UniProtKB/Swiss-Prot annotation:
This is Matrix protein 2. The M2 protein from most influenza A strains is inhibited by amantadine and rimantadine, resulting in viral uncoating incapacity. Emergence of amantadine-resistant variants is usually rapid. When the channel is activated, one or more imidazole moieties of His-37 probably become bi-protonated. The keyword Secreted does not apply. It is a single-pass type III membrane protein. The lineage of its organism: Viruses, Riboviria, Orthornavirae, Negarnaviricota, Polyploviricotina. It comes from Influenza A virus (strain A/Silky Chicken/Hong Kong/YU100/2002 H5N1 genotype X3). One of its GO terms (biological process) is symbiont genome entry into host cell via pore formation in plasma membrane. Residues 60-83 are annotated as: Disordered. Pfam families: Flu_M2.
Length: 97
C-alpha cells in the first residue's frame, strides 16, 4: 500500500502538488479566512490580558453626571469621602500562633 495521497505524486524533478482548482474563488476565500483566523488567534494569545481587561473594566465608567447640578455632585463627593474616612480606623489585626 502506498503512502502517497491523491494530491502529491512523485515526478522526476521531485514532489509536485496537483491542485486542480486552486484558482477557484471559494478556495481563495477559504485560504484568506484561514490566514486571518490564524493571525487573530495569535494576537489574542499574545494580548489576551490587555484585551479582556479592557473589555471588562474599560467599558464601565461609573454613573453619568450629565444634567446633575454642581452642588449635588459636590455633596456626593463629600459623602463618599466621609464614608472612606470613617473606615480608616476599623482594621482588625489577627495574629496566628
Amino acid at each position: 500500500m502506498s503512502l502517497l495521497t491523491e494530491v502529491e505524486t512523485p515526478t522526476r524533478t521531485g514532489w509536485e502538488c496537483k491542485c486542480s482548482d486552486s484558482s477557484d474563488p471559494l478556495v481563495v476565500a477559504a485560504s484568506i479566512i484561514g490566514i486571518l483566523h490564524l493571525i487573530l488567534w495569535i494576537l489574542d494569545r499574545l494580548f489576551f490580558k490587555c484585551i479582556y481587561r479592557r473589555l471588562k473594566y474599560g467599558l464601565k465608567r461609573g454613573p453619568s453626571t450629565g444634567g446633575v447640578p454642581e452642588s449635588m455632585r459636590e455633596e456626593y463627593r463629600q459623602e463618599q469621602q466621609s464614608a472612606v474616612d470613617v473606615d480608616d480606623g476599623h482594621f482588625v489585626n489577627i495574629e496566628l500562633e
